Amino acid sequence: DRSVSRGLGDVYKRQTFTGGEPTLRRDLVELVEYSRWFVTRLNTNGILLTPDLCRELYEASLDSVQITLYSWDSGIHDSLVGRKGSFHGTIEGIRNALNAGLNVSVNTPLCRDNQDYGKTLAFLNGLGVRYVTCSGLIETGNASSGGSVSSQLSVREMGEILTAAADICRETGMEIGFTSPGRAEVKLLKRLGIPVPMCGACLSNMAVTPDGLAVPCQSWLGGVVLGDMKKDSWKSIWNHAMCKKIRAMGEEESLFCPLRTGKSEKGGDT
């Protein structure tokens, strides 16, 4: 709570509860309600989104919930998640969130195993989902291993998927976003009417770990700590040397995720 309350007199206005898996916290509803003067969002796999929890989150004024679904195919989803049976839990969570009146979006990290994204969009449309986002895999944590990196889609492959996805969304009235800097060509995204993603670490967003430590973004899982939100001033965190270094990136550099290991293939105008 102290980390949240420090934002009241400082500069940030949006609060996202993410993880790990934030629905494991028994005090999640309390934290959301405590943060009601922020624009609040919950990022989750959806498995623990019971009807009661969704109702409580709605009553606590949660502004939106983003649920991750890897595929319309239960086998593919469970394989990528690494847990058999997780697909059905996630789908039930999506249904419960929609039924509770929550503002729901569904994110799909794309790779070679789930590149039939059009079928996932059709499936989500059938559930009543109106807002979707997709991304490449972020090379952090377990996804930084050789197998995960090799499953990344090329810029060309991602472009083909996005082109088809944009057509489907226009036909169904869904809205689509793309969140991976450098994973798709800028010109293509502009032509499709999809906002061009740029790295916002240490500028438009930072992350706070469960023990109150500030890090550049939610995917930056190790190596850099910008300060302790429980005791350090926001000014000292904002002016940390790493923050300044990241914010000093030029426009071309910000079209890439700093965590990306291979940057030879550009997603810019080339």
Where does each model-flagged region fall?
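Active-site groove signature of glycoside hydrolases
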Residues: K13-E21
